[in-house]
Amino acid sequence: MEFLAPVEAGDLVDCVPEPVGNGSVEVQALVDGDLRARLVAHPPGGVHDMGKDWSDRPLSERLPDHVEPLVDQWINYAERAGADLALCAKAAVVHPSVWPALANGVMTRHLVDGSWIHTSSRIAHHAAVPVGVSALVEATVVDRFDTRSGSRAVVDVRISVDGLPVVTIEHEALVSLGPSAP
């Protein structure tokens, strides 16, 4: 999902699907014909294989795995995060807002000490997940670099349930604020 411009309360949003090849479909969210957000839905299998070889990236620093039971605080997480869409609650499936929160957990457990800023995420959803199961969160740091604002890390986060991939996220953050070089 890529958010390009705000959608205001009361805006009529047109969701327009367009085939883009390889069986993928881009869904564009338009307000008065202006593109506000888009996502690309890929067919199952092969698109984001679990266990990808990261030899094309600067790093391949594997972080410890984490098992997260999708109960308690995750059941109503979307509502607390401001997404009042009742569809997921009625269907008893995990709301998509949970996945970047789990990726944030990777950052706070392993990469940051103190203040930090989440800068971007590219999220690919592979399957709906029922509430109450446990998710395996696997993460690999694939890039680190310094900017004027601080040190950044890019992490590939793979989330699976019962061995099946449900979400992959490329999660980037400023993990150390302030100039990193003298």
Model-derived regions, located:
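HotDog/MaoC-like acyl-thioester-processing domains
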Residues: 2-12, 16-65, 128-182
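Hot-dog-fold acyl-thioester-processing enzymes
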Residues: 2-4, 40, 44-120, 179-182
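Structured core of small recognition/catalytic domains
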Residues: 87-151, 156-160
